[in-house]
Amino acid sequence: MALSHRLELRQGQGLVITPQLQQAIKLLQLSNIELDAFVEAELERNPLLQRDEGDHEPAVEVEAERDASLTQVDAVADTTAGRELDTPVDDVSPGERATGEGTDAEHAGGQIDWSRAGGGGSFESDEGYERALTDSPTLAAHLRTQLVQAALSPAHNAIAEILIDAVDEGGYLRLDIVELADRLGCALALVEETLSVLQGFEPVGVFARDVRECLALQLKDLNRYDPAMAAMLDHLELLAKRDMAGLRRICGVDDEDLREMIGEIRSLNPRPGAAYHSEPAETLVPDVMVREGLGGMWHVELNTDTLPRVLVDQRYHARVSKGARSDQEKTFVADCMASANWLVKSLDQRAKTILKVASEIVRQQDGFLAFGVEHLRPLNLKTVADAIGMHESTVSRVTSNKYIATPRGVFELKFFFTSAIQSSEGGEAHSAASVRHKIKGLVDAEKCEADVHSDDRIVEILKAAGVDIARRTVAKYREAMRIPSSVERRRLMKEAV
């Protein structure tokens, strides 16, 4: 076959993502702190932008019904703008990104390299994301990885998220669990059960409320926590004073045993969380606020304190436009004007989109707001996206690094999403975490060899309860919870007898 050169003209359709639309999409996933920093950089770069120092307008507010199926929130008036911002860019090719017609890989919550944030809003560098990959994990991230593997029920998982946020850099829990139970409207025993699970996480000793509990957790892990050790931990002040006679008397041991005990105590780590990368503490400011109104309605509104307010200085634009002489000066003024107008529009779209998504989440999870953490419903991104007519990727960006203040506390919007398993009777779906909780409950109820359930038997019991689940799924959940097989459980019971 002969090779030859020729020209062809082809017509086709393709997705074109301009740098400006790229910027608008990126703004969606920024936290209010990151957004404020970005706007500040734009104010310094663009002379036509100025901060609006006037009085804030009343917060945009919508109402959500308690019954999620009754009404649909109409929070965004500018539907055309909303559709622009909702462009699904997840499948744009690397080649398009290189030419500025695509967008870089979407990583919800990824770090932005602010040194490259100017120039019309192009985010072409992944340096910040690459740096994040090489950084050592934070203590909170390490704990959340273990939380996923723990396969807790929705209620326990929700409480665990709050407890993780309350752990300081040393690994200590800085939260009163009695107050937490009261705030969440749940039994104290539920919080205590969750804390007990979390105290089994690595590093050993994490989630302790004081030094004594921290050391006790580590000794229990080493199988060295006995009455003598408990007595020593109850009188650590004597150890600090080096009152050996007092310790011998209280612990009931001789000199040799006492020396061994002290050596073991000194080998422990009183700050188990210190080995992990720590983040500077930041004040948590909610992006959205929800309060209960009359007639079973929930009022959802934006927190105007977190919304950067910028204006285009039209007078200054007119003045510099008249003074522009060269083509380069005129181009610069035109670019600044276009960039300023787009930023103002993008910020408005961002605010409306956040409100729309948050309102739907409130309607879906009204049970949690009204009755407490045990009433969290199974919810995923697709459900919210379909309800408000947006793309899943948009909902994902909106819920990253955004917080909502509720009567039960401040939560990240992603807190309200839990997976589900379909009902065998066609009814409401079951949370996957709640199914794992049911499996654990069945195993915990086994008292003798005859009570031990095989995976097949567990499937039968769950199907009788309306949960449609396969045997391999039961086995997967059981293994994730580190529950031995039925054969192993029978053997352990026989040995215990």
From Swiss-Prot:
BP term (GO), one: DNA-templated transcription initiation
Molecular function terms, GO-annotated: DNA binding; DNA-binding transcription activator activity; nucleotidyltransferase activity; sigma factor activity
One Gene Ontology cellular component: DNA-directed RNA polymerase complex
Ranges annotated as biased composition (Basic and acidic residues): 49-68
Domain of life according to the entry: Bacteria
Keyword Transmembrane helix assigned: no
DNA-binding region: 380-399
Region called Disordered, residue ranges: 49-128
Keyword Cytoplasm on entry: no
Motif (RPON box): 471-479
Gene3D superfamilies assigned: Homeodomain-like, RNA polymerase sigma-54 factor, core-binding domain
Pfam families: Sigma54_AID (PF00309), Sigma54_CBD (PF04963), Sigma54_DBD (PF04552)
Entry keyword set: DNA-binding, DNA-directed RNA polymerase, Nucleotidyltransferase, Sigma factor, Transcription, Transcription regulation, Transferase
UniProt family annotation: Belongs to the sigma-54 factor family.
Its biological purpose: Sigma factors are initiation factors that promote the attachment of RNA polymerase to specific initiation sites and are then released. This sigma factor is responsible for the expression of the nitrogen fixation genes. This sigma factor is required for the de novo biogenesis of both flagellum and stalk, and for polar morphogenesis and normal cell division. It may not be involved in nitrogen assimilation.
Protein name, as recorded: RNA polymerase sigma-54 factor
